[in-house]
Amino acid sequence: MALSFFGGGGASHLKYFDIRLDEDYIVFRGGEQEAASAQLSGKLLLCLSEPLSVKHVRLNLTGISRVCWHLPSSSATGGRKSWREKVFYEKSWTFRDAGKSKTEILAAGNYEFPFHVILEGSMPESVEGLSDTYVTYRFKAEIGRKYAKDIVVRKPLRIIRTLDSSALELSHAMSVENIWPNKIEYSISTPTKAVIFGTSIRVDFKLIPLLKGLKIGQIVSQLIESHDLTLNPEDPDSVRNTYKNTRTIVNDEHELDEEGNLEIIDEAAEGYQFSRFLDLPKTLTRCLQDTDTRGIKIRHKLKFRVQLLNPDGHISELRATLPVSIFISPNLAIDDNNNLVDQTPQSAQRAVNDLAQQAPPLYGEHQFDQLYSEVDPSGYRTPGPGSGPGTPFGTLSRNLSAENLASMNALTNTDISASALHSRLSNLHASRFSNPSPSDADGHTDAEYRRLGVSTDSFGPSSGSNSQSPASPELSRRPSDEGYHDHDYIPSGMATPFHPQFAEVESLSRVPSYSTAVRSSVGPCDSELPDYQAVVAEDTAMPTLQSPQQAHIRSVGRGVSTGHTGIDVHHLRSGFFNSRTSAHHDDDDRRLRLVQARARV
């Protein structure tokens, strides 16, 4: 910063005093009601070659809006000026404060005073380019001194409100098309309604004469900017003091070559089809962005005039208008004089390409989102520690047939060998062939589950649910449904150990191998699965039970219709458990018939 900007009397002690922002401008994406907040941060830099006595070191950010217009003078009265200025935003930072009527000495050296603030997305955007009407933000850094003039440095801040990548203006084409009877069929369109400031507007024309001998004359395309200024925008419409004005931003005149431009359009008629490009100014003093804030409303539209030279000699004129929206792109930097920094056509084309390839939302623009590297992964990664009891680990759920037990030592890191596991499983199957008393069965069940690490509390296995029927390895692929109906109320995972038990997972995942399956008898293809009545009819010596049979209980418990509706499941279970000891052998025979019927399918 040049020293001429400082006051005298000790200002020469300052080698450097400036406001440095992390970002040159603040960008809001979307309207005032939808845009997210943005963070403004930077540093106040101070370099002293000698000690300096100061009262305070402060930084202020001020937002000011001003609306002003001049009415033209007449012969009777002179010109009249209407204006209003208001401060709508203020933020202050105090870095040094010696107190009232006191000073402190800043030693020679370099100083950095960081600052930051969150700017709401509803804040007005910067509007600059008009002589007496604007919305601006300015920083003011001040070093207060007691017996000398304060040292002050200023810096402007630009807030840009651009369109969100999902805005309809970026995807909707604008067109006007109609038929002038016995004159011309026309279509005038633009690819998008939104246009980046400093680029160009493409206009597509399609003109088809309907009158023989009709010729197209001069075609005029204009970009019109309208200003709607209001001194008191917060008041009702009836009492607002407003002023409206328009100006022409771009004027393009074009004449067709009657011979060269004539072509066949849509394989139906002869006409003219061409495009015109309207280059926008590179400075805000000649063209503003569309806005509506703080009593300043700027809008743009395209106006077209097409001369039609009739065969009888008179001239007709076709007129049409199209609305367009001009917005400032963050990819095209604007300097303090409101001019584009890079005004080359290549820069404008890059901005258009970046907008077309933009994938919403831009990752770099979300400054307040927590980065993935800063997120605690606990609770997000799966499977969690609690999912192990009910989930096979790795390859342990595959190829665990009786013939493949020898290879399990290579798949697990447990201390249980394959032979030991095979022996335990054999003992477990052998114990199921025996017919212990109910008390013995209960004790055996508790011991087995304690050995396997399974709790026998109210959520664990009960004595009534442990089936005493034989279970063969060959039929272990189809899970048996008998004897487990009384656990339908237990949630999944409540009866399994919390910590992973690899040996239990292996035993539960044990399935017959392919060679075992092919040795099984195959029933005829046209045979159907026997129903419940067909299987029960084969048992002529079946004793009468005090309650429905176990298979019937399971069907009712699972919601399968059996012809007995409205039965209380709880009472059915109690009746079955009371008669379980007396009908045990008959139940085994009945299950065997069920298994044989399934094998024939």
UniProtKB/Swiss-Prot annotation:
What the protein does comes down to: Component of the regulatory network controlling carbon source utilization through ubiquitination and deubiquitination involving creA, creB, creC, creD and acrB. May be involved in signaling by recognizing appropriately phosphorylated substrates via its arrestin domains and then recruit a HECT-type ubiquitin ligase such as hulA, leading to ubiquitination of the substrate, providing a link between ubiquitination and phosphorylation in protein regulation and stability.
The name of this protein is: Probable HECT-type ubiquitin ligase-interacting protein creD
| Tagged with keyword DNA damage | no
Entry keywords, A to Z: Ubl conjugation pathway
Which terms under GO biological process does the entry name? regulation of protein ubiquitination; ubiquitin-dependent endocytosis
Q: Where is the composition biased (Basic and acidic residues)?
A: 475-489
Family assignment from sequence similarity: Belongs to the arrestin family.
Provide one Gene Ontology cellular component. Answer: plasma membrane
Q: Region annotation Disordered: residue ranges?
A: 374-397, 454-496
According to the UniProt entry, where is the signal peptide?
none
One Pfam family this sequence matches: Arrestin_C
Q: Where is the composition biased (Low complexity)?
A: 455-473
PANTHER family, sorted: ARRESTIN DOMAIN CONTAINING PROTEIN, FI21816P1
Q: How does it assemble?
A: Interacts with hulA.
**Listed GO MF terms:** protein-macromolecule adaptor activity; ubiquitin protein ligase binding
Q: Which InterPro entries match?
A: Arrestin-like_C, Arrestin-like_N, Arrestin_C-like, Arrestin_domain-protein, Ig_E-set
What is the protein's species of origin?
A: Aspergillus fumigatus (strain ATCC MYA-4609 / CBS 101355 / FGSC A1100 / Af293)
**Entry annotated with the keyword Ribonucleoprotein:** no
